[in-house]
Regions:
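Feature captures the catalytic cores and cofactor-binding loops of soluble hydro-lyases/lyases
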Residues: 1-111, 125-173
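Channel- or pocket-lining gating/hinge segments that regulate access to a cavity or pore
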Residues: 121-123
Length: 173
């Protein structure tokens, strides 16, 4: 489920930002929000986190600031954003569309794309590519597991990395 926010004060807004996405999301969805308006205000907050969690949403990714991050953490509701902020969106940013194509960090995201997120970052994949990407990621993870095992067995880092260097340089498209 996607949401697009822009800067400014809406002429007429029939609803609070992101609420339609919360109510339209299927159980297990992640809400992804384009909030590249340039306005330093929250595009997501605590009440939305509770509403989303109650409706079965698994988490939120916002390309911009979010507020009430500690509250979301206490709920066990993942919120991944560019930065925390206390300033609300009221009169500063509003929703222009949801369940639409958006851009996150220069990457095209459409409803139905798969989202992987953790404290290291966020990845968006077209659903058709998930199986292949997971297969390749498993291969990389196994190689890294063996490298760590060798280091713990006493091998020198230059040797371990050196043995794997050429493969590590290979970009997987």
């Amino acid at each position: 489920m996607t949401v697009k926010l822009v800067a400014g004060k809406p002429q007429h807004s029939p609803r609070h930002l992101c609420t339609a996405a919360i109510e339209s999301a299927a159980r297990g969805d992640v809400i992804v929000i384009e909030h590249s308006s340039g306005v330093e205000c929250a595009g997501w907050g605590g009440v939305l986190s509770v509403g989303a969690q109650v409706n079965g949403v698994e988490g939120v990714v916002i390309d911009g600031p979010a507020r009430d991050i500690d509250e979301a953490r206490q709920l066990g509701f993942p919120v991944y954003g560019r930065s925390p902020i206390s300033r609300t969106a009221r009169g500063r940013a509003y929703e222009i569309d949801f369940n639409c194509e958006i851009q996150i960090g220069g990457v095209r995201v459409i409803p139905g794309d798969v989202v992987f997120a953790d404290s290291s970052g966020v990845v968006f994949l077209p659903a058709a590519q998930v199986e292949e990407v997971v297969r390749r990621a498993a291969r990389i993870a196994e190689r890294e597991r063996l490298m760590v095992q060798a280091l713990r067995a006493g091998d020198r880092i230059t040797e371990v990395v050196g043995r794997n260097y050429e493969e590590m340089l290979t970009k997987l498209d």
